[in-house]
Every structure is written in structure tokens, then in C-alpha cells.
Amino acid sequence: MDEFHRYGKEDNSRQQCFLYPLFFQEDLYAISHDHYLDGSSSSEPTEHLSSNDQFSFLTVKRLIGQIRQQNHSIVLFVNCAPNPLADCKKSSYSESVLEGLTLVLEVPFSIRSKYSVEGMNEWKSFRSIHSIFPFLEDKFPHSNYISDARIPYSIHPEILVRTFRRLIRDAPSLHPLRSVLYEYRNSPENLQRSIIVVPRVNTRFFLFLWNYYVYECESILFSLLKRSSHSRSLSHRPFPQRTHFHRKIKHIIIFSRRNSLKSIWLLKDPKINYVRYGERSIIAIKGTHLLLKKCRYYLLLFRQCYFHLWSEPYRVCSHQLSKNCSSSPGYFLRVRMNPLFVRTKMLDELFIADLITNEFDPIVPIVPILGLLAREKFCDVSGRPISKLSWTNLTDDDILNRFDQIWRNLFHYYSGSFGRDGLYRIKYILSLSCAKTLACKHKSTIRVVRKELGPELFQKSFSKEREFDSLPFSSKAAARSQRERIWHSDIPQINPLVNSWQKIQDLKIENLFDQ
């Protein structure tokens, strides 16, 4: 692999001509077999394969031949196997073939990413959920329109193969990819004409497909931002100091006020900001409504022409931030106009100036969270707490820890929003549901449970001190935390309740357009 990378660096065209012979290199499948054994979440392959069984590369080559012949008797996906215990050894070979296919397809993309790192990076994408909140705090108050777009994840397999052909000209290396995609499309779990490309499938092959697909979708926005820049030069590379560049131009043409204003206006780029998390992306625009319509039209039209699929209009929702709210990622997002009165006194005269500032205002979706708690059997549809019957077979500590974890996740995730009073209603529902669950387990009442177990158990799980354990222990700090917004850094992944709520919102929008 390193030798192939070295040849690709010397001659970039060679990366598109020598991919297919890599499928028959035994070292490649040894690496993929080790990746499969190390990254497998299930221990069934290692349990049912004895130590005397050796990995045969001849069997792997025969499987490759069966893939090329479109022989659907083999199962390339473990989840589609009718009897995974009987076909365990076959599944290990199939996963090794998929790993080998992924390793081969990753070669040209790794070379291209290496070149982009060595040169000047023109496209910087956020790679962590912790980058979303500073982006919202910094960019949203200076934007007046927002476009909430969902990446289309249902795509025909032939379109994916054609997108790979734009980079890889080695046609034989794409035949196994085409066969695998068509077999997955014809599998019993996916009986439709298109395949679903989502990041939730925890296999290297589908993660690679998703990353490549998202890269192609985001390249559309990159070209839009590149074309909208009026001050591009130096081979379309960005200026390291754009602020000083504008100041120099303004200083040079200051003698002509009319021309200078026009020139400076042309040099100012339209503020188009982009952020993505998972399958949803947000485009914040500072400009007119016509610019928003053009951006939305460009996005839909380019997706239709580039991927040869019909982009559903409801997947790109555009509205004004000061009047409407957006529901991503798990918040109701809006920009609130905050009037600020400033009084200045000069000598004996008093001047009053009214300033209006924009403030980012994320809102906690209390009603959707109550609906999700009702679905999870923590309360009824009216918000009245009920016992969690499925947890009555657990120990008291496990029950308290589970309720405590749910409340802590909710509070930490929504700690950066204004109006957190509704969260304490959620806290009351969870605490009372916890008490009813313990009472149902011990076949007694809530009063008896409190008397026997003691109130310190509930204070341990639902005390206010745990909410501010990262702050200085003072009353002023606790009072200030009620007014200020704190984005906690211990949310490496989005709350499962937020994901469920987002799915419900998507289904409501899709059903509205289907009627």
C-alpha cells in the first residue's frame, strides 16, 4: 500500500489504472481479516471458529469470482444471513471481502486528501459536535435567513458507481462495488429500487460510502461559496488577512467617495455559513430574500443534475430567523431582537440612543420532550408521571442511576439555552416516575418508599448541586448560572431522545407533503 502511495505521488494518473490488481493481493485480505476480527462488535465469529481453522485466500478469490458473476447464493451482509450461526465462517470471509474492497477504494481518496493537507486547505469542515455551538453563537446573530437542508440518503446504486467513475477510471475495480451495492439493494431487508446510505450502519464499507457521499454533497456548497467570492485571486486561494486587505483597498480609493463605496461593496462577500451534524445541515445567510431563493434553487438543481435524482422540496426548508424557528440539532433555533438603551451625557445635554442587537436564542422543546417521555412510558400523554414497569426487575441503585443519567444528559445538553424553567418540569416527572417505579418494585406506596429508603437517595440523584459541580461552590456562581448559558463539553454524542424527536419532526414534514 505504501509503495502504491509512492507511485501515486510521482504520477497522479497511475492511481486510476492499477486498482484492480490489488484485489488479488493476499496481504490486503490479511489486513482486512484482522480489521474484521478487531472491529467486530459480536464475538460469534471467534467463538465458532476453532484455532485450527486457517484463513484461506483461495476461498477469498473464489468469493470474488462469485461476486463478479452476480451469484446471490453467498451472503455479503451478516445482518441478512438467515442463519448467522451456520453461516458464521462464510460471513467472516464476506466481511473480509468488503474490508478489502473498502481498502482498495480508499487508496485514491487518501492520496487526494494527503495532497490537500500538504497544500493550502480551502475547505474546512467541522468534525465535532462541540464546534456546532460556537458556530451558532457566532454566526446566527449576524444572519437573517436560514436554510435547513437534509442530505438525501436514498440513492440508486448506479449513481454511486458513476460518481466513483469521476475519480477512478479503472472500470474493473468498480465491478465488485457495483455487485455489492446491487446485492444489498436486492436483500430481504431492503426491498426497493434504491439503497439507503446512512451513517448509522457501523461497518467500514458503509461509513466509507457515507463519507464519500457527504463529501460530494458538500462540494456543491464549496463551489457556491467559491463562485460568490468577488475578491479571489492567487489561483482562487483565500487571503490570509482579509480584514487588512479590505482596509488597504479602502485607503487607496478614498479620494473618490462614490467609486470607493461601490468598490468596497463589491469586495464584501455575501455571508454564507454552513454547518452539518449527521444527516442535517444548516445554511445561515446574511443577505436578501432573493439571495436565499437563489441559494436554495442552486442547491436543489445541482443535486438533481449531479446525482440524477429528484430532490424533495421539503428537504430544504428556508425561513427568516427573526420570525420562525428551526428544529436542529434538537433545539428550536431562532434569533431574538434585543433592544439596548444607551444614554450618553456630554456637558449639560443628555442623549438617549436606542440600539437593537441580535441575540442567539435556542429554546428547549418541552412539548416534544414530554411526548417522547410518554412514548418511553415515563408519563402519560397529559404529562402525569407513571412507573417504569420494565425496570422493576433491576436493583434500586440501577434504577436511580438510569433516571439520574437521563436527567443529567437532558440538563447538560440544554444548559446553553434560555428559559430552562421547563426543564425542571421534566425533572419533576423523572423524579416522581423514579419514586413510583421503586414503589411498584417493592409493592408499596411512595410514602413508604421514602420512609424506608430515605430521602437522601432521591437527593443523591436529583439534587441541584450536581448540576453545578463544575462551577465554583458559591451562591453567586449558582445564581449567575441561572442567567448565563453554559455549553457543557461532556456531550460527545447527541442525546438519544433528541434523535427520536428529530425523526418524528421529519416524519411530520414528509407526511404533510405526501397528502
Curated annotation (Swiss-Prot):
Domain of life, per lineage? Eukaryota
InterPro entries membership: Domain_X, Maturase_MatK, Maturase_MatK_N
Recorded GO cellular component terms are: chloroplast
One short Pfam name that applies is Intron_maturas2
Q: Which GO terms describe its biological process?
A: mRNA processing; RNA splicing; tRNA processing
> Where is the protein localized?
Plastid, Chloroplast
Query: Is Magnesium one of the keywords UniProt gives this record?
Result: no
One example of the protein's molecular function in GO is: RNA binding
> Per the record's keyword annotation, is Cell inner membrane included, yes or no?
no
Which key words are in the record? Chloroplast, mRNA processing, Plastid, RNA-binding, tRNA processing
HAMAP family per UniProt:
MatK
Q: Outline what the protein does.
A: Usually encoded in the trnK tRNA gene intron. Probably assists in splicing its own and other chloroplast group II introns.
State the similarity comment: Belongs to the intron maturase 2 family. MatK subfamily.
The entry's protein name is Maturase K
Originating species: Pinus armandii (Chinese white pine)
Q: What does the organism's lineage look like at the top?
A: Eukaryota, Viridiplantae, Streptophyta, Embryophyta, Tracheophyta
